[in-house]
Amino acid sequence: MATKLLALSLSFCFLLLGGCFALREQPEQNECQLERLNALEPDNRIESEGGLIETWNPNNKQFRCAGVALSRATLQHNALRRPYYSNAPQEIFIQQGNGYFGMVFPGCPETFEEPQESEQGEGRRYRDRHQKVNRFREGDIIAVPTGIVFWMYNDQDTPVIAVSLTDIRSSNNQLDQMPRRFYLAGNHEQEFLRYQHQQGGKQEQENEGNNIFSGFKRDFLEDAFNVNRHIVDRLQGRNEDEEKGAIVKVKGGLSIISPPEKQARHQRGSRQEEDEDEDEERQPRHQRGSRQEEEEDEDEERQPRHQRRRGEEEEEDKKERRGSQKGKSRRQGDNGLEETVCTAKLRLNIGPSSSPDIYNPEAGRIKTVTSLDLPVLRWLKLSAEHGSLHKNAMFVPHYNLNANSIIYALKGRARLQVVNCNGNTVFDGELEAGRALTVPQNYAVAAKSLSDRFSYVAFKTNDRAGIARLAGTSSVINNLPLDVVAATFNLQRNEARQLKSNNPFKFLVPARQSENRASA
């Protein structure tokens, strides 16, 4: 019987995640006819005892076109974001800080447990058991599948800032096109509720700040948990201060079960990846260089420019070869279950300390994560990119082949230009820290940094998002025959040759010397 129940639970878990090969729902007609894009700030702020949650309006036209919702949570020291689950998959980027997070997968075993001598109660030993708890750090991408309970905790003095994208157009979302948070505790306001009312949604109950247990009758919960009424009242959030909110302060901090070697690394302030399987997978990249940005820049600038350019190209070529090799192996023997749900890797670091996929010491760096790097993203149908640009450096005009891109500025500011299918400029302005810009699929975009260092994270609505460059080596123009370029643009052959070959860079173009002198 127990075996059947476990099998049933695991089957249910696969059903939760099993939309991995389903198509993403398409936007409604005319939703993506955007004449103007805007760099948006959060327009809703909900304070909590231990932090705050800010949200962007998901009814905004550009978010509706992309089918996503965006939010940002800030956790103070010893703050816990209460467990919740969502009606759509999430990608969470850790902009600042480090701490713990956990997820609960139905049917998976409780693999972490306390020592026997750790706790006693009512004359018998009790050992806490639970599913795996992970550490996160700045630069991590965390993948949260639909319906999976998620929580996070900040055990450090530095506030944690986590930016979350919810893919509400995912085929795994069987509700309406509105993000929903199902909290397991508290009686606070649901962060996207006000937008639901703006959209014309009906008020479901008088008290709209209750948790998922609040609607059950007490006797049901007393029988279900075999506990007394006092505990049930706490479970339902009765008489709790609404100001406690979704992020609560933990007096004295949480006691987290964690392997000793991980605790030791954390106490030493180690920047290494903490999961052994991540270390093994990423070791070749770290051997190629895992120093901080400034150290790499100083070392690399002593190299001749042609060597640096070749290094950038080789790095990208290696990335492409890795992708093609992985894709080939999966086509040959892919059953869709290379890793089980219970042991799936849920995070990967793409921050500035990780080895970049594209690097130019005079221009900047880019790091991407797709389902080839983090297989759980195949369930979510999402990917991400982290990049930084030096002052006046440029990311050449390009477009996303198969994904919408939501660019969130982390630091500094840059000038971006976005062009639609009619050749009209739909955005020509600055994107500064804390703002977000949606770039729809196939819209062309280029960026130039206006700060000493502009950094961003881009969430993409495809687990293998691809880019086509419109300028530079290996670009669309560069790969057209010379005579085709000349005839297409009505150029002389020598002019066409200049158009194809004058930019020796692939992605990142350093500032011109005249611009450097002017900025100095």
UniProtKB/Swiss-Prot annotation:
Q: Does Signal count among this protein's keywords?
A: yes
Q: How does it assemble?
A: Hexamer; each subunit is composed of an acidic and a basic chain derived from a single precursor and linked by a disulfide bond.
Q: Which family does it belong to?
A: Belongs to the 11S seed storage protein (globulins) family.
**CDD domains in the record:** cupin_11S_legumin_C, cupin_11S_legumin_N
User: Which source organism?
Assistant: Pisum sativum (Garden pea)
Stretches assigned to the Cupin type-1 domain: 37-233, 348-497
Renumbered to this chain, the signal peptide range is 1-22
Q: Which gene encodes it?
A: LEGA2
Under Gene Ontology molecular function, one entry of this record is: nutrient reservoir activity
Reply yes or no: does the keyword Transmembrane apply: no
Concerning InterPro entries, the annotation shows: 11S_seedstore_CS, 11S_seedstore_pln, Cupin_1, RmlC-like_jellyroll, RmlC_Cupin_sf, Seed_Storage-Functional
Task performed by this protein: This protein found in the seeds of many leguminous and non-leguminous plants is the source of sulfur-containing amino acids in seed meals.
- Any Pfam family from its record, for instance, is Cupin_1
The ranges of region (Disordered) come to 250-339
Q: Which UniProt keywords apply?
A: Disulfide bond, Seed storage protein, Signal, Storage protein
Under what name is this protein listed? Legumin A2
Q: What is the disulfide pattern of this chain?
A: C32-C65, C108-C342
Q: Which PROSITE patterns match?
A: 11S_SEED_STORAGE
